[in-house]
Regions:
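Conserved mid-domain beta->alpha element of the FAD-binding
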Residues: 244-323
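N-terminal FAD cofactor-binding segment of flavoenzymes
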Residues: 7-55
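C-terminal helical "tail/cap" subdomain of flavin- and related membrane-associated enzymes
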Residues: 277, 293-417
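Conserved FAD/dinucleotide-binding core of flavoprotein oxidoreductases
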Residues: 167-241
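Conserved N-terminal helical subregion
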Residues: 40-130
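Flavin (FAD/FMN) cofactor-binding core of flavoprotein oxidoreductases
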Residues: 49-50, 232-250
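N-terminal Rossmann-like FAD-binding beta1-loop-alpha1 element of flavoenzymes
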Residues: 1-7
């Protein structure tokens, strides 16, 4: 086996920050089974705390529930660097240098199979867009990510685990326990802003310090209860930040080269989701595991039709990842809000909801189909009167928050609640 990379192990360590790439339970266990769990000191995420806000910055409700298996986010610069060294240690040939279509053609002639897992500029357009399986043609969120340390954990102990802050229609923000290359335990902050909305302010950011200042301003305005936690934070390094947009796409898994030979695509090269559902690295890991088992058990040649059939077989389960990711990009339905509201009162419902990050198929159909949602809640003895009681509690809480802000207004002046 040969692995071709345009960067050395040291190049990866010196690279800019990479996406957060939080792996959930089954994928963490699979890496461990492969002997790739090199960072036992990295913080594990065992719970997720979600705050759902209204447009006037009021907290509607919170969901706090355990994950069935711990999640783990390790700096990809560490993982890619260690991975290259480990592949070589296990006997594979590692070749450093750029690879273009002509190189792929040459490699396809001398190897049983060539697998492409990167979509760099020289290979752009190699895999054809699947018009049926691709839902979006434009970015659905403006993205910003940075790693920070020096935050005030005492101000918000919830951040010992994962925290999600949602303002539907405006901003989703993820505060992820993270193992950073330079400082170790830190937090990776992932911002998903609705394009053109109040939180879409990162397009002109040119540095980590500038990005953090913009982020603090957004948090002060939209999630002020997080301000004390974030105020003393600083970037883990000048390069651990990313901004941009993603157009979710599914591509055909087999590309035909000019010679007529073919290559297989895996991971983001063929299935690229918006990071909102945290499925990029998880989806790539599931796909790699499936194809590793299929390829190892196949005695014949790896023909293009056979590879396409295997992808279709994988898609029977893999499509749930896309449906989950695209579903979260859409506005929350009334039934989904009801599930989340029930989860704020029932930890078992929250645990089932969080399991979707580990196994998206576990959310179907009950989280995306109204009738199935009602059946799901009924099986857990959450009836209409329970939901009504939950909603009345939320309403009373919102009124209390508004009254509190009115009381805090200065006499003889004006203030914005």
């Amino acid at each position: 086996m040969s692995l071709y990379s345009d960067r050395t192990a040291e190049d990866h360590l010196c690279d800019r920050g990479r996406p957060t790439a939080c792996l959930f339970g089954d994928q963490v266990e699979y890496e461990a089974e492969l002997g790739l769990d090199f960072w036992p000191e990295a913080p594990r995420m065992r719970r997720i705390h979600l705050d759902l806000f209204t447009d006037d910055r009021s907290l509607a409700f919170s969901v706090d529930a355990p994950l069935r298996k711990p999640a783990l986010a390790v700096d990809q610069r560490l993982k890619f660097s260690a991975g290259l060294r480990e592949v070589r240690r296990r006997g594979a040939k590692v070749v450093i240098g750029p690879v273009d279509v002509d190189d792929l053609d040459r490699l396809a002639a001398s190897h049983d199979l060539v697998v492409v897992t990167a979509g760099n500029n020289s290979l752009a357009g190699l895999f054809e867009r699947d018009q049926v399986r691709s839902v979006h043609s434009e970015p659905q969120r403006s993205l910003f990510m940075m790693n920070v340390h020096g935050y005030d954990m005492a101000a918000r102990p919830e951040h010992r685990e994962g925290v999600f802050s949602f303002l539907p229609g405006t901003l989703e923000m993820f505060w992820v326990p993270f193992h950073d290359k330079d400082v170790g335990e830190s937090r990776s902050l992932v911002v998903e802003a609705t394009p053109g909305g109040r939180a879409d302010r990162f397009g002109d950011v040119t540095s980590a310090d500038e990005g953090l200042e913009v982020l603090k301003a957004v948090v002060d305005e939209l999630f002020p209860h997080e301000s004390a936690f974030l105020r003393p934070a600083r970037p883990t390094s000048p390069v651990t930040w990313i901004k941009g947009q993603v157009v979710p796409v599914v591509r055909r898994p087999v590309a035909v080269l000019p010679s007529g030979r073919h290559v297989l695509g895996l991971g983001d090269a063929v299935v690229l989701n918006d990071p909102l559902a945290g499925q990029g690295a998880n989806n790539a890991t599931r796909m790699a595991r499936f194809f590793a088992e299929e390829l190892a058990g196949h005695d014949g040649p790896f023909t293009a039709p056979w590879l396409a059939e295997r992808f279709d077989e994988w898609w029977e389960h893999g499509r749930y990842t896309n449906d989950f990711s695209n579903g979260l990009l859409a506005p929350l339905t009334e039934e989904q809000r009801t599930v989340m509201l029930a989860a704020s009162r029932r930890e078992d419902v929250g645990e089932q909801l969080w399991e979707g990050f580990n196994d998206p198929s576990s959310l179907f159909p009950w989280f995306f189909d109204a009738a199935a949602t009602r059946e799901f809640l009924a099986r857990r003895n959450v009836g209409r009167l329970d939901v009504l009681r939950y909603k009345l509690g939320v309403g009373a809480n919102l009124l209390t928050q508004k009254a509190s802000r009115l009381v805090k207004r200065p006499v003889g002046g004006t203030a914005t609640p």
